[in-house]
């Protein structure tokens, strides 16, 4: 469930390569992934261009190992009605025959600004999330 109390217009852009710029509609994002990584992924962002960022919609693997499956939801509108919104994120599998190595991990990311790692977006976005379930 999620409720996007406010999704606004980007009012910051540090020009670190984000696909949005000041004046564009920002997007929140909820993303999940199943990965088979041999170590933790290091991601850095802030005052310089981000390092280690990855998007499972654009790549099937990173240095740490393969991305087995992912689900993603971009939210580009503020919610209305004051009630949480139920949503299911279907998993898109890159590898349907992968055998567990014992290293499978679940990644869950919820961001008020999908491109916040790039220091671009709306500073006043508000996103609430609750009640994650893995249904299989």
Regions found by a protein language model. Name each.
Residues 10-12, 117:
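Outer-membrane beta-barrel proteins
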Residues 1-7, 14-18:
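A short beta-strand element within beta-rich, extracytoplasmic domains
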Residues 81-83, 98-102, 112-136:
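Extracellular carbohydrate recognition
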Residues 37-100, 122:
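Extracellular carbohydrate recognition and processing domains
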């Amino acid at each position: 469930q999620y409720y996007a109390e406010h999704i606004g217009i980007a009012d910051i852009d540090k020009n670190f390569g984000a696909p949005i710029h000041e004046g564009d509609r920002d997007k929140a994002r909820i993303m999940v992934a199943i990965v088979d990584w041999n170590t933790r992924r290091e991601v850095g962002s802030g005052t310089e261009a981000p390092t280690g960022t990855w998007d499972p919609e654009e790549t099937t693997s990173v240095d740490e190992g393969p991305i087995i499956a992912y689900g993603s939801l971009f939210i580009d509108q503020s919610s209305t009605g004051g009630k949480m919104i139920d949503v299911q994120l279907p998993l898109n599998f890159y590898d349907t025959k992968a055998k567990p190595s014992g290293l499978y991990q679940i990644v869950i990311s919820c961001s008020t600004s999908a491109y916040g790692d790039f220091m671009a977006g709306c500073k006043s976005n508000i996103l609430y999330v609750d009640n994650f379930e893995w249904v299989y």
